[in-house]
Amino acid sequence: MGSRYPSHQLSNGLFVSGRPEQPKERAPTMSAVAMPYTGGDIKRSGELGKMFDIPADGTKSRKSGPIPGAPSRSGSFAGTAQSGPGAPMATGRMSGSLASAGSVSMKKTNSGPLSKHGEPLKKSSGPQSGGVTRQNSGSIPILPATGLITSGPITSGPLNSSGAPRKVSGPLDSSGLMKSHMPTVVHNQAVTTLGPEDDFSCLKSFPKPVLWLVVLIFIMGFLAGGFILGAVHNPILLVVVAILFTVVAALFIWNICWGRRGITDFIARYPDADLRTAKNGQHVKVTGVVTCGNVPLESSFHRVPRCVYTSTCLYEYRGWGSKPANSSHRHFTWGLRSSERHVVDFYISDFQSGLRALVKTGSGAKVTPLVDDSVVIDFKQGSEQVSPDFVRWLGKKNLTSDDRIMRLKEGYIKEGSTVSVIGVVQRNDNVLMIVPSSEPLAAGWQWRRCTFPTSLEGIVLRCEDSSNVDAIPV
């Protein structure tokens, strides 16, 4: 008996209504490899790397032309791209127009010749499938190896455009990044550069009119004593003047040699103030542990990082036929040939109150440093105990040794050192600061050391040699 509705029999013998289903082409099965961990490497991040125009690893090969054994698939698409190093086919840039509607084959097309790393030598931009056009104008920004997009040009900082450390001249060590950063730090306005005139000297604060008056009195005394000795043959006046001259000369020599020791004793006896009760504008002495501010320093010779004060001075001894180190260098004395002394703002944690204060020693502030030298190296050409580090440092600074007798002195205050600071308290918007004083601090006579009265200008920094002492970690 016929029926208006068509029916068909299934494979199990059951009759159902409707026409039999047309056999469909089975969709191709594509296997995918699990993406490995890239570790943040932008060169191994597939599509993100292509977006920023970064080539893949050189070990991956690129192929041009149709994929062998790729089945056709219905739909409109412009090709596929596999990302990551685990894909069976390496990534490539798509250029040109691919077939749109209908059954098309999956293709990857690279235009132009390939380099030895499998990378197109010439990038081309053109219309994509589906009428979508991609145009690149100008240079595409390059990401560092970390894949982080940050503000500012990529050339600023210790990394180059590929994310690797910048190459600097000289031997490479663990502080290579700081070496490339040091020239910008030294010329920073926040760094105070100290000269020879900023160093402490007892004779610098001695009144010059008094000094010349004493010299004039002794000259007149010697002339009068010599005249009396020649006229009446009486040497008493000449002997008295000679004894007084010897005493005064010995006192001056003593102050030149031991005047610094006297002023350090004065600072040690100066009472520490409590920052909690210190008034605004009060002269205080604070002792505590220092912490670097925004601009840390590095010593020139030993490359000690994270310092708040550095001093590297090269001296030369001028003999009878030696060359002068500077224009005012006299014979048979040590003259300053090279000086690198810098200080910046830093923080100090007071031992008594526990408060943290900002010490304003940077930005051209007046500072009187009393820091012991951590390194003293004597150099003489032809000596068997010549330091190779010292010779290398001379070459880096473009300083010749010749046959000169030289001495290198380096001192520094590194982070975590214990420092005594004398300055004026200033409170500004709940920020506790120690700033330079407008008037010098008078030390007066130091009878225990037999030193002349002297004065200390600006902020006084006192730190003993801490090269052999472990700094407090901060």
Swiss-Prot record:
Domain of life, source organism: Eukaryota
Bilayer-spanning residue ranges: 210-230, 236-256
CC terms in the record's Gene Ontology section: plasma membrane
Membrane topology: Multi-pass membrane protein
Compositional bias (Polar residues): 1-14, 73-83, 97-113, 125-137
Region (Disordered): 1-137
The keyword Transmembrane is assigned to this record: yes
Assigned keywords, A-Z: Membrane, Phosphoprotein, Transmembrane, Transmembrane helix
Residues modified as Phosphoserine: S45, S169
Localisation: Membrane
Main location: membrane
GO biological process, one term: negative regulation of cellulose biosynthetic process
Protein's recorded name: Uncharacterized membrane protein At1g16860
